[in-house]
Amino acid sequence: MKPKVRFFDLQPYGDKFVVRDPVGISQPFIATPELLFLLSLMDGTRDITDLQAEFFKKTGHLIPKEEINQVINFLDENYLLYNERFLNKLKEEREKILKKGYREPSHAGQAYPENPQELKNFIEETVNKNSEKFKARGILVPHMDLRVASGVYGSVYSAIKENEYDTVVLLGVSHYFHETPFSVLPLDLRTPLGDLKVDIERVEELQKMFDYDLSHDVLAYKNEHSIEFQTIFLKYLFPEVKVIPAIVSYGDTKSLKEIAHKITKVLEDSQNPLIISSVDFSHVGRKFGDPHSYDPSPRDREYINLLAELKNEEAFNLLQSDNNRTRIDGQFTNFVFLEILKNLGVKEGKLLDYDVYHEAPTDSKVSYAGMVFY
């Protein structure tokens, strides 16, 4: 047997690490650096004898084969090995979600109130801003913690709450395992205020334009807050609207333009579509691999100015030019977002609000903004 560990996420935890499953099938566990090194050797090319020898060669410590076998069994039991057992479980979980017919809210009662009346009060307080109103065709909103970023959420949704929309294209990012470049969730979105209906006719029409299954990455939506956080505002402000929930995961400018063109195509008979990009901006500091935090606003402003002018290629190239050094979120999502808006005749965008959250214990910062496009 030559075990192959599948992809997982790591988060520092003192002198150890929390190992998290980006697919959401397995429970997190604590791992030492030594264990992580052993896991890194499990790439499908080594059997137990090879693993023992390579670990000894690099560390000078001889692990008994029985212990290595225990680790392999633990990984297998928790579907953390890339093998037939994991693939069957993945298929089973996908089918389970699709069969259910709707996406359960995973953050209700934690990030926002689960009680309907309390949630209504929370949203009403958030969107009760006397801000300038816009007949916006597109909005860029954070997916930052609702309690932290309520002011920015409020700036945007207050600006459009008097509008009417018949279809919403909700573009998020994936914080979890996502194989395909682009996916669509063909399910209603349950909220404490009722179900936000999926625009299933347009979703099915969109699927016909792609040569891969757009629901293949349905598991990525299970805990995805970039989708969920917008649903509560949409259900409250536009209760009858239908939604196309989607994630843009990766792509080059050519393929991203093709995605945008296809989305635009299914909106041809929509009288009042709204396009949403649910993204945050820079992620800097020790939590994200920097030696310390720093002010990301100069870089953010440069990027925001390009977004406001709908210069998606320039904005994309700016981030690509230095490997997105401040880790601005949603570069692929924003490219598709702006391309759709240009296809719909939108001419300009405006920054309504911008802020930076500083997490003192980890000396890390996350920036976020609210914009309207019209």
Curated annotation (Swiss-Prot):
UniProt xrefs under InterPro entries: MEMO1_fam
Give the coiled coil ranges.
none
At the top level of its lineage, which domain of life is listed? Bacteria
Concerning Pfam families, the annotation shows: Memo (PF01875)
Q: Which PANTHER family match?
A: PROTEIN MEMO1
Xref: NCBIfam families: AmmeMemoSam_B
Question: What family classification does the UniProt entry report for this protein?
Answer: Belongs to the MEMO1 family.
Name this polypeptide is given: MEMO1 family protein aq_1336
The organism encoding this protein is Aquifex aeolicus (strain VF5)
* Taxon lineage: Bacteria, Pseudomonadati, Aquificota, Aquificia, Aquificales
